[in-house]
Structures are given as C-alpha cells and as structure tokens.
C-alpha cells in the first residue's frame, strides 16, 4: 500500500507538471482526489490494516494528498497569472494616443426657449410656480370664471379622466391654486410653465400636448399699462430690440379687458410677407386684466387688488425664434433636427 501511494503521488505530480490548461489540472484533481479516485480507495482499504499500521498509513495518505493539492494550487495560480499576462499583452493601451472626443448632447429647442423665457421674467422679479398636470375641474375652469354651463368651455376640448378630474388645458390652474393658497392675500408675481393637453388633431401648428407658459401679477394699483410694458420687455429680450408689439381686443373668460398680442414680423419687418400673411404682424400670446370674479373666488378684494395675466405656447415662440415650420418636429426625436440646437 505504501508503494502504491508513492506511485500515485509521482504520477499525479508528473501530470500536473505536464498540464498546459486549467481544464487539464481540474481533470487531475478529479482523477486523483475525487470521491472515486485511487487515494480515496486507499483510505477505504485502511480498515484491513492492523492497529499498528493504520496511524502510519493515515499520515502517509494525508501527506500524499496535501502534496498533490499544494502542487495543483501552485500550478493553477501560475496558469491564471499567465492567462492574465497574455491578455494584458494583447490589450496594451498606448497612453500617448489622443483621446476620443466626447459627443456633446443637444439642448432641446423647447427646453432652451422655456429657460430663456424663465430667465427674462425672473430678471423682472417673477418666481416660477409649477403644478400638477392632472387637475380638478374646479381649478381648471370654475375658479377661472368658467362655470359648468359656460359656453366658453367649448373653446377647449378637454381630456376628462373622471367627471371632476381632467388633464389640465392650461397652466392657469396653477395661478388659481397660487391665489387661493396665498393666505395673506398679498401681491403675487409668478410664471407657470408646464405641459397642457387638449383634444386637437395633430398637424403642423396643433398638438394634443404642448408646453404653455402663463404669467400672473396681483397687486394694488395694477394697470393695463403695466401689462403692456411687461410684454414689451419680454418681446425685445426674446426677439430683439427692433421688435414692435400690437395689442388687439379679444375675449377670455378669466380676463377683462382681454387682448391678443402681435409682434412685428421678423421676416419682412412689418412690410407684409407669406409668414405674416401680408399683415406685417404675427400673433404670439393672449393676455388681459384679471377678471374681478377670479380675484373674488380666490379670496381677494377686487376693489383693492388688481392684476394681469398672459399666456403663450413655448412651441409657438420656438417656431418663430428658430424658423421651424412644423410643431411636430419638436416631438419626433429626429437627431438631425435636434443637432441644430447644440449649445456653443
């Protein structure tokens, strides 16, 4: 049995030395140290030995097994190291090579326009107010002087979720909530950017979802001249100092009087062209003095406080500013289109 163990040890060590791959070493381990290997068989046969021989043979078996396992571990370590060194040799990095340029992302034109508009009004002392896109009918309509039976509701075809819940049709709902939540009923000066939803057929100038930015100022002694002056500053900041504005009478349930504002055409400079349909003017937003009913419903004394409000579509402003002829370009994720608006 002793000679058998020495023979097994010598043969196993030779096979380990000859192995060139990890798989070969694993085969040796299974063949010699596995449950069905010869060393295990020797252990099972030790029961036939005398009590005097058993301790000596047990120690010899352990010595042989440890010698094989130690050589296996050393060889496995050497092979793994060789594999890593070979891989590193083939994947050597030349640190002197120039780096690859980083592709810069595109600033989406709508994001750019909204940020520019916010910057203009923040510079005039406004705060940015945001609200939920899923809104109650009350704040979207009733609090804005549009009771349930008001015919002006037909001006906006609405996505209703339940009878009293809807996707907001304008960010005026944020204004209504801001006025109501102003416990002191003091001055307010906010702009409200956000997505709004209407059941419009998508075409070159309409979308069922679009970005709207509305503004609200509430204070004592607010006049129409304050509204006009504010809009003049906005237009010159967004479209250039040479832009002129024109206010036309209009109707909105939540303002009285109401106006629509046009700017002088940037293509023909007011002379008349295809862009402005020969008028020399382009409509960009609606505005007016806050209706007394809206103030009263929010808890304000309409005899003491007045206000003005305005609202515009970010897509409309972006189309005019960048010369885009189809609103759908903003939502098709066409990289060729978006790359035109990379930041310098």
Curated annotation (Swiss-Prot):
Mg(2+) binds at residue 256. GO terms for molecular function: ATP binding; catalytic activity, acting on a protein; magnesium ion binding; phenylalanine-tRNA ligase activity; transferase activity; tRNA binding. GO terms for biological process: phenylalanyl-tRNA aminoacylation. It is found in: Cytoplasm. Its EC number is 6.1.1.20. CDD domains: PheRS_alpha_core. It catalyses: tRNA(Phe) + L-phenylalanine + ATP = L-phenylalanyl-tRNA(Phe) + AMP + diphosphate + H(+). Belongs to the class-II aminoacyl-tRNA synthetase family. Phe-tRNA synthetase alpha subunit type 1 subfamily. The lineage of its organism: Bacteria, Bacillati, Bacillota, Bacilli, Bacillales. Its cofactor is Mg(2+). One of its GO terms (cellular component) is cytoplasm. This is Phenylalanine--tRNA ligase alpha subunit. Tetramer of two alpha and two beta subunits. InterPro entries: aa-tRNA-synth_II, aa-tRNA-synth_II/BPL/LPL, Phe-tRNA-synth_IIc_asu, Phe-tRNA_ligase_II_N, Phe_tRNA_ligase_alpha1_bac, Phenylalanyl-tRNA_Synthase, tRNA-bd_arm. It comes from Bacillus cereus (strain ATCC 14579 / DSM 31 / CCUG 7414 / JCM 2152 / NBRC 15305 / NCIMB 9373 / NCTC 2599 / NRRL B-3711). Keywords: Aminoacyl-tRNA synthetase, ATP-binding, Cytoplasm, Ligase, Magnesium, Metal-binding, Nucleotide-binding, Protein biosynthesis. The keyword Membrane does not apply. Binds 2 magnesium ions per tetramer.
